């Protein structure tokens, strides 16, 4: 059975971020994606200038009411949320999650708690971080913070892998069943590897891959692709280990392709065959 995912996050017309990054790779793995855009911008914000608008929160609810009106909401297997244009949008998304789960009690909510990194040029609206801590976290079935977001969610510093596993379990105690720490950064085992953790109440998996050096300008949308692909693999019945290994390899293939083409925007179309069947393999370790 094809899985249907309502993906509520940002959209850029040029390039790849949010839905514009994740939607195609998710489809390439065999999922139906229903993109619902929280913002429509000309390009991602790390260029330093952009045009476009943030969608009114009511717009998100209206679109989903339209899907409910044609009696298709019960076919939705998961809601994925990413970059929010405002905290109020977040409240509407939680209303949508409740509506989807009422129509399909098996549906999952995957929250990618994008909180912004001003030094990276990723800007989020006031109140969004607080929304994720108070409301997004307890409502989610799966949550995917990076290290900075993990520290904000658990409200204390995280300095190494062991502390990251414990912090993830603190989050699990508040609602989600699965936590993906999608970039361990300085808390990882090695400074020259890209490392992730996938944690449940009784399992923890660690994986690492080589860093791909883009110099000063790291491509945007890597986390969006990572979250989207992990959700697809889990919905398709992959184990935690299988999902983590495939996603790590697929994202690495995109990064390597992007670097080889000397591009700044993720080359998801050029890498499409290796997203579905990665040529590299990275082994996850059970902690």
Curated annotation (Swiss-Prot):
InterPro entries in the cross-refs: PM/HMP-P_kinase-1, PyrdxlKinase, Pyridoxal_kinase_PdxY, Ribokinase-like
Keyword Zinc-finger: no
Catalytic activity, as annotated: pyridoxal + ATP = pyridoxal 5'-phosphate + ADP + H(+)
EC number(s) recorded for this UniProt protein: 2.7.1.35
Keyword terms of this UniProt record: ATP-binding, Kinase, Magnesium, Nucleotide-binding, Transferase
Molecular function GO labels: ATP binding; magnesium ion binding; pyridoxal kinase activity
GO BP, sorted A to Z: pyridoxal 5'-phosphate salvage
Database matches in Pfam families: Phos_pyr_kin (PF08543)
Cross-referenced HAMAP family: PdxY
Family indicated by similarity: Belongs to the pyridoxine kinase family. PdxY subfamily.
Protein name: Pyridoxal kinase PdxY
